[in-house]
Amino acid sequence: VTEQRWNLVADIGGTNARFAALREGQLESEFEFYHSVEEYPQFSDLIIKLRDEIALATGFVGAPHSVCLAVACPADVEHISFTNSHWEFTKTHLLEWFDCQELVVINDFEAVAHGITELGADDCIKIGGGEPQAHKPVGILGAGTGLGMAALISHSDGYHVLDTEGGHADFAPVGQRQMDVLTCLRQNFKRVSLERVLSGKGIVNIYNAICQMEGTDPTLTTPPDVVTAALANSNPQALTALDTFCESMGAAAGNLALTLGARGGIYIAGGVVPRFSEFFVNSGFREKFEDKGRFASYLEPIPVYLVTRNNLGLLGAAKKLQNN
C-alpha cells in the first residue's frame, strides 16, 4: 500500500466515461477504468464505485490530490450539463465527492488539443499536404457522440488551447447530394448543425436521408451497422452515406483550416473515424478539403493527420494538470 500523492483524470463523453489514476507527474497510467454513461442515473453513483475500483487496482490510498475532468459540454460554468447525455452536476459537488485539493474541469476537446501536443509519429496517419509550419495555428476536429472542435495557438511560453463549440455551427452543404441530405434533415431538425452530420449519430442521419432520397426503407439503425455494411459493400445506401460523411468532413476541415489559418496542420480525432481509417484515407475527404475555389492553393500544402492513438482525452487531461 503506497502513501503517495496521486491524481485522477477523466474523459467523459455522451456515451462513455473513461478514467485514469496517475502517480503525480505522470502523463500515462496503466490504471484505466471504463464505464457506460447510460448505466448510471447520476455521476455520483459512478464515483462511489470508482473509488473502490481504484483502491483495489492501484493501492493508492485516500483521495486524489488533483482531479481533471474533460467533459463533452461547455466547462467554464459552475453547473455542468452534458449536451448528449442525462448527467449533470456542479463543481461544488465535485469537490465534495472527490475530496481533492485541486479540481480542473475542461471541455473534452480542450483535452484532446492538449493531448495532440504529446503525439508521436506512430500515433497518426498523414492524409496529404506538405510539412506543418512551425508556430502556425493547428486545427482539431473530431467526431464521437458529438462533434468537437478546438485549436492550438503558438506563443512564447509554448501553446494556448482555444476550445470552441464549432461543432454546433451550421452544416454548409457542398454539391447536390449534400444539399439534398440537408433538405431531408431539415424535416427532422429545426436547425441542422455540423454535429447532426459529422458524428456517430450523424452517419445514421445521413443514411436515413439517402434512403429517403432513393425511396428505400432504412434497415440499419446504429452507426456500427451503417459502417459495417458500407465496408462490406453490402448496402449501397450505407456506402453512399459513408462517402458523404467523409466528403462532408473534408469540407468542414477545410473551412476550419481557412478560419484559423491552420498552416500548422489539421488533426482529425474522435472515436468514429478510426473505425474506418483505411476507407477514410481513400475517400473524397482530401479532395473536398482542398476544394475551396480561389483558395485551393492555400489548402494544398496544409497537412491533415488522422489520430489513431487511443484515449487522447485522458492524455490531454493529464497534460492540463501538468501545465497547471
Regions of interest found by a model, annotated:
Residues 57-105, 113-123, 140, 275-278:
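Short beta-strand-loop/turn "lid" adjacent to the catalytic site in phosphate-handling enzymes
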Residues 126-194, 278, 284-290, 294-296:
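Glycine-rich phosphate-binding loop of actin/hexokinase-like ATP-binding domains
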Residues 7-11, 66-68, 104, 138-142, ...:
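Short glycine-aspartate micro-motif
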Residues 17, 74-76, 146-150, 205, ...:
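Short, acidic Gly/Pro/Ser/Thr-rich loop/turn segments
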Residues 102-133, 224-236, 243-246, 251:
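ATP-dependent carbohydrate kinase catalytic cores
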Residues 21-22, 48, 80-82, 117-118, ...:
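Short amphipathic alpha-helical segments
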Residues 37, 82-85, 104-111, 130-133, ...:
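Active-site nucleophile and cofactor-binding loops and adjacent substrate-binding regions
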Residues 1-55, 59, 63, 180-324:
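ATP-binding/phosphotransfer module of carbohydrate and carboxylate kinases, centering on a glycine-rich
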